[in-house]
């Protein structure tokens, strides 16, 4: 049984979050949580929270055994970017993109 959890509009770029997602793809959830606990990146905390939510969803909604679960799929899509202005010298301005992402974790007992 596949169970999904999503974090939409996460305040990190998809490029940075994908680095963390690649670390746990296909792993057992216990090993994945351990990897995320000791990964020194902001995105690791966000991905860990989504993974814990997916595990809780599987246990509560589907009655799955946590020991059998593995990360079947994990992907990070780009969300909308917030445009901001950074003042520069001589009256100019640069545009800053505050990027967001959508993190999706699918756990499965198969």
UniProtKB/Swiss-Prot annotation:
Provenance organism: Pasteurella multocida (strain Pm70)
Residues annotated as transmembrane: none
Subunit: Part of the 50S ribosomal subunit.
A GO MF label: structural constituent of ribosome
Gene label: rplV
Matching InterPro entries: Ribosomal_uL22, Ribosomal_uL22_bac/chlpt-type, Ribosomal_uL22_bac/org-type, Ribosomal_uL22_CS, Ribosomal_uL22_sf
Record's protein name: Large ribosomal subunit protein uL22
CDD domains, A to Z: Ribosomal_L22 (cd00336)
Alphabetical GO biological process terms: translation
Family: Belongs to the universal ribosomal protein uL22 family.
Keywords attached to this entry: Ribonucleoprotein, Ribosomal protein, RNA-binding, rRNA-binding
Function: This protein binds specifically to 23S rRNA; its binding is stimulated by other ribosomal proteins, e.g. L4, L17, and L20. It is important during the early stages of 50S assembly. It makes multiple contacts with different domains of the 23S rRNA in the assembled 50S subunit and ribosome. The globular domain of the protein is located near the polypeptide exit tunnel on the outside of the subunit, while an extended beta-hairpin is found that lines the wall of the exit tunnel in the center of the 70S ribosome.
A single cellular component GO annotation: cytosolic large ribosomal subunit
Protein's UniProt keywords contain rRNA-binding: yes
One Pfam match: Ribosomal_L22
């Amino acid at each position: 049984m596949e169970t999904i959890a999503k974090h939409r509009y996460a305040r990190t770029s998809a490029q940075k979050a994908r680095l963390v997602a690649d670390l746990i793809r296909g792993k057992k959830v216990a090993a994945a949580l351990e990897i995320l606990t000791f990964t020194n990146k902001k995105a690791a905390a966000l991905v860990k929270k989504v993974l814990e939510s997916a595990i809780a969803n599987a246990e509560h909604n589907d009655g799955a055994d946590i020991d059998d679960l593995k990360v079947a799929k994990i992907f990070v899509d780009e969300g909308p970017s917030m445009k901001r202005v950074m003042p520069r010298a001589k009256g100019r301005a640069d545009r800053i993109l505050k990027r967001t992402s959508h993190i999706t974790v699918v756990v499965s007992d198969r």
